[in-house]
From Swiss-Prot:
Subcellular location: Cytoplasm
Binding residues annotated for FAD, in chain numbering: G10, A11, G12, L13, A14, G15
Catalysis performed (reactions): uridine(54) in tRNA + (6R)-5,10-methylene-5,6,7,8-tetrahydrofolate + NADH + H(+) = 5-methyluridine(54) in tRNA + (6S)-5,6,7,8-tetrahydrofolate + NAD(+); uridine(54) in tRNA + (6R)-5,10-methylene-5,6,7,8-tetrahydrofolate + NADPH + H(+) = 5-methyluridine(54) in tRNA + (6S)-5,6,7,8-tetrahydrofolate + NADP(+)
UniProt protein name: Methylenetetrahydrofolate--tRNA-(uracil-5-)-methyltransferase TrmFO
Pfam family, one: GIDA
Enzyme class: transferase
Family membership: Belongs to the MnmG family. TrmFO subfamily.
GO CC annotation: cytosol
Listed GO biological process terms: tRNA methylation; tRNA wobble uridine modification
Length: 447
């Protein structure tokens, strides 16, 4: 009798989670990762689950949709959440991680698992048989991307994504910045804040909107747009002189202890590694040329002599028309046993990508074991996210973060307090998941 087996292509957040979930269910997994032998424009290492943009997994509370999504995943035994919590760094009310330690932890867990065999090579074609999870990401290599296009018969959609610069903390002028979390969240001093006066802000704004960009010049990219949730800072600025002050440079919830007043605008720096030597510029993903980044960002008080350990970069992300191609189980409508997961399916965000991998990994293992895939309840964040990407209008399909608006409304009288209403939705989700999991996944949730 053939031993149950799953092939996972890609060891990013989704692929790593898929491999882990399948292996936990007793299935043998072959995990393919092309890095470091074949790399991409934005990856720097051969580690699994490397974070190429922010180091933040966003909000942590149950009044936040992504906080609920993370809690569901944690209770389901998510490797990504386990390692994120293990390697968390101070970030106020958010969950941020030490980038390299997190990726190293994920890599170690997968390479040491007795049910997982890692193969470091590029996969250029979709395996013709067996149970397969494709989680090769938005930067899928050209040969595999073409193979997926041939299989689906659909042209991929695309958008630009960008990452923020990282600075060496030793080169920040600490006399000009102050430590404080917005509204005192977290430990109260998790962020470094670079305050700007009105005059400094206006000069910075003018320099930013006139700086030279480093956009790709491929004709095929002419119509590609940015994902709204990850707009480059210069694109936000072009929406109006005050757009930044209501976006990544908003000063609300911050008082400069040296003046006793709220600054006109603020640039926040968030710890990027466990040692506290690297900080990233929060919300400052950018498509500017590197020389322009150095010139413009050094206008920010405290960063006049800053050394950038990584400049912001831009890259092209591709995704599928999942409403036409996938079931809410992550399985292909065209071929039983073939699953897709991660950002390439039209979810946006680290946590959302990993959640898709969790679903695909569980269901791929079930297929390998001769069981039917399961669809997560709509009342859960996981179920609502997978329902959205497989039921949205395919002609106007765009990447989506998890949001409470994707979830069914509460029954009964409306709860008018927004925070209470969101928490009630989260509590309902966790109750439904707890009741559903034992009968459908064969095991209770983690505490």
């Amino acid at each position: 009798m053939t031993e149950p087996h799953v092939t996972v292509i890609g060891a990013g957040l989704a692929g790593s989670e898929a491999a882990w979930q399948a292996a936990r269910l007793g299935v043998k997994v072959t995990l393919y990762e092309m890095r470091p032998h074949v790399t991409t424009a934005v990856h720097r290492t051969g580690l699994f689950a490397e974070l190429v943009c922010s180091n933040s997994l966003r909000g942590a509370g149950l009044e936040n949709a992504v906080g609920l999504l993370k809690e569901e995943m944690r209770r389901l035994g998510s490797l990504i959440l386990r390692e994120a919590l293990q390697h968390a760094v101070p970030a106020g009310g958010a969950l941020a991680v030490s980038r390299e330690e997190f990726a190293a932890g994920v890599t170690a867990a997968l390479t040491s698992h007795p049910n997982i065999t890692v193969v470091r090579e590029e996969v250029r074609e979709i395996p013709p048989d067996g149970v397969v999870v494709i989680a090769s990401g938005p930067l899928t290599s050209a040969p595999l991307a073409e193979a997926i296009r041939r299989f689906t018969g659909e042209e991929s959609l695309a958008f630009y994504d960008a990452a923020a610069p990282i600075v060496n903390i030793e080169t920040v002028n600490m006399d000009k910045v102050f430590r404080m979390s917005r509204y005192g969240k977290g430990e109260g001093d998790d962020y470094l804040n670079c305050p700007l006066t009105r005059e400094e802000y206006e000069a910075f704004y003018e320099a930013l909107v006139t700086a030279e960009k480093a956009m790709p010049h491929n004709p095929e990219d002419a119509q590609v747009c940015f994902f709204e949730g990850c707009l480059p800072v210069e694109e936000i600025a072009r929406r109006g002189p005050d757009a930044l002050r209501y976006g990544p440079m908003k000063p609300v919830g911050l008082i400069d202890p040296r003046t006793g007043r709220r600054p006109w605008a603020v640039v926040q720096l968030r710890q990027d590694n466990a040692a506290g030597t690297l900080y990233n510029m929060v919300g400052f993903q950018t498509s500017l040329k590197w020389s322009e980044q150095k010139r413009v960002f050094r206008m920010i008080p405290g960063l006049e002599e800053a050394e950038f350990e990584r400049y912001g970069v831009i890259h092209r992300n591709t995704f599928m028309k999942s409403p036409r191609l996938l079931y809410p189980t992550g399985e292909s409508r065209q071929r039983a046993g073939l699953f897709f997961a991660g950002q390439m399916t039209g979810v946006e965000g680290y946590v959302e990508s990993a959640a898709g991998g969790l679903v695909a990994g569980i269901n791929a293992a079930r297929r390998a074991l001769g069981l039917e895939p399961v669809t997560f309840p709509r009342e859960t964040a996981i179920g609502s996210l997978l329902h959205y990407i497989t039921h949205a209008d395919p002609e106007h399909f765009q990447p989506m973060n998890i949001a409470f608006g994707l979830m069914p409304p509460l029954e009964g009288p409306k709860i008018r307090d927004k925070r209470a209403r969101k928490r009630a939705i989260s509590e309902r989700a966790l109750d439904v998941l707890a009741a559903w999991a034992p009968g459908h996944l064969g095991a209770p949730l983690l505490d």
